[in-house]
């Protein structure tokens, strides 16, 4: 059970290539794509109808792209600083990602008051942060 998004941990999962590589998704047929998330990678390329080879990687996957072990990577991007440092760039955003509160069904029932109060406090905090952010952008 997922009662609410949390107001932190916002990032995105993206397809990443070496900087300056001018390529379209369609031209990636047969490419070797490295990722810590091979199932998401396979699903993405399958949905767009492009056959690629997916390589499961661990650790700093950006080094595999920089070293030429893979043609591209799929990884989580927050600020993009790591990409810039490693001469990489986002080619395509696959999906937005955020932290979420997850409650198991038994706790939802046995600790309803506590869980409900926690969810309500988080939602209130999100509204306050959103209002503060909106005021900051208007100034």
Where are these regions (language model features)?
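Domain-level signature for soluble enzymes in the chorismate/prephenate branch of the shikimate pathway
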Residues: 1-139
């Amino acid at each position: 059970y997922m009662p609410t998004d949390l107001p932190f941990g916002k990032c995105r999962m993206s397809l990443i290539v070496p900087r300056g590589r001018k390529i379209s998704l369609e031209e990636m047929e047969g490419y070797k794509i490295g990722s810590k998330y091979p199932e998401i990678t396979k699903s993405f390329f399958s949905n767009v109808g492009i056959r690629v080879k997916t390589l499961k990687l661990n650790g700093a996957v950006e080094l595999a792209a920089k070293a030429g072990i893979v043609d591209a990577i799929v990884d989580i991007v927050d600020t993009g600083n790591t990409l810039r440092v490693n001469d990489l760039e986002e080619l395509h955003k696959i999906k937005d990602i955020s932290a979420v509160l997850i409650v198991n069904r038994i706790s939802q029932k046995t600790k309803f008051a506590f869980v409900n109060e926690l969810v309500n406090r988080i939602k209130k905090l999100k509204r306050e942060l959103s209002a503060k952010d909106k005021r900051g952008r208007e100034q």
